[in-house]
Amino acid sequence: VANGFSLATSLKKTPILLLCGVPLLALIAFSDSHLYWVRDAYDGWRIFQIILLMLLGGYAVFMHTHSTSFSQPLSKTLATALPILFGLMVASSLQAEHSARAAADAALYLLLAISVWAQADLFRKNPTVAAHIAAWIALLPLFTVISLLTGLAHALAGDTIDEWHKSFANIRMLDDALLPCLFLLWQRPAWLAKNTFRNPLLNKLITSTIYFISASYMLILYYDGARAVLISTLVGLGFIAIFRRDSWSKLCLPLLTLLGAGLLFLALKHIILTDFTANPILRTGSSGRDDLWVKTLQLWQEHPILGVGGNNFVTSNPWLLNGHPHNLPLQWISEWGFAGLLALLLLIPLAFNFFRHRQILPVFALGAAIAVGVDALFSGVLDYPLSQMLAVWSFAWLVSFLPTHPLNSSLVTDNEHLVKMTSNTPFLSWQHMLKVIAVVAILTMLFVHGRDIICSNCMSTDQDNAPRFWQYGRALHLVPYGSEAINNAPDALRINR
């Protein structure tokens, strides 16, 4: 009996532990902790992400849902479209030049989508825990703030400037991960919110601290010259200003800190050497995006139906350095063909569902979804492991606030019951399809990258170091550090493709 009780208690705690996965990944990344068994931080984050996504996929397989946020027409659309989408992605992967890369890429994005569904269910069942996790996620970039402020202090003192990005080998990895955290901070969930039962002085202290943290996050974006993230932030705030006029007063926090951080940045530019700034904000040019976008359109023109295969953009001609095109819609249609186009079309009714219920959704959680969507048009926010998980976490939290409709579970056997049970069929169809997809995606990920997950002291390698799935995006597998493959990157590339 004791053992049975202990097992039941452990099973009840498992969903709570799953909720801690994303904040733990963010803590490891922002704190520059080396809690992984591979050489590069990015590869370690990816392995952690794979494990977490497979666990969430497993939860989804055994998840029992008694309500739905989707209308009957939307459920029918999903029930029809999901098998077609899955079939097209399988066909795209099989015909790709590097089919293992394509299969792993398809599995990754399918598991990301399923994790939204799974985490939204967990958030509905544990709303208080979810709110507290949101508050902690919002504060985790403070580790980077401390690193930046330390670097500024050294620069003001005339000392050597240390690299303050720490584990983030690419500034876009940091800036894209910071975007969801910024909107979560502005939402002020859980204990970050004003509380009438709290001491007024404590309320003012917390509010003042949030203003300081928000300005610090904005300062990071200014110093990185993060044009895409800043534009996405403004679009998200603009959406709130236009479609949530009841929340205008809440815009004071982001707008004042946006302005204050900008003025501070300009002042520091006159005091500190300009080379402390990664990129100027008002720079001209597309940073090579136009060449990347032209390549995606060429690839889609050559492979309009099935695409070149997931994660095959980087290995396809013409050769370009970048591992992804910095535009998710173009990435999907060039790599997946009709499957990518169908996935984008499915986002339209889902977005309309959010828009229809915008008045009851947390205003900055809604703004975060808009901002991430815009950022995905210019950056790799949905390509890099940390920003992927933080963005997906924000989406799932937003989904959990949508109104739900209970499914009928009555045991009555009259005609009315038969009609009601029929109305549940579309929901049950796409739910069962998602569970099948989750199993296939987990098995695919284990088949392709199972050896990489357990590879100790390993790293990815190629001659270019353009991140995509791994830090070195042209590699398929990790190889032991110090091996012959590391010393001859071109050979390693041929082997790992």
Task: Indicate where each model-derived feature is located.
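TM-adjacent membrane-interface loops and short helices in multi-pass inner/ER membrane proteins
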Residues: 288-322, 329, 336-343
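Loop-to-helix entry and N-terminal half of a specific, functionally important transmembrane alpha helix
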Residues: 22-25, 356-383, 387-391, 398-399
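Flexible juxtamembrane loops connecting transmembrane helices in multi-pass membrane enzymes
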Residues: 256, 260-293, 315, 454-467
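Hydrophobic alpha-helical membrane-interfacial segments at the cytosolic entry of transmembrane helices
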Residues: 84, 132-143, 213-214, 248-269, ...
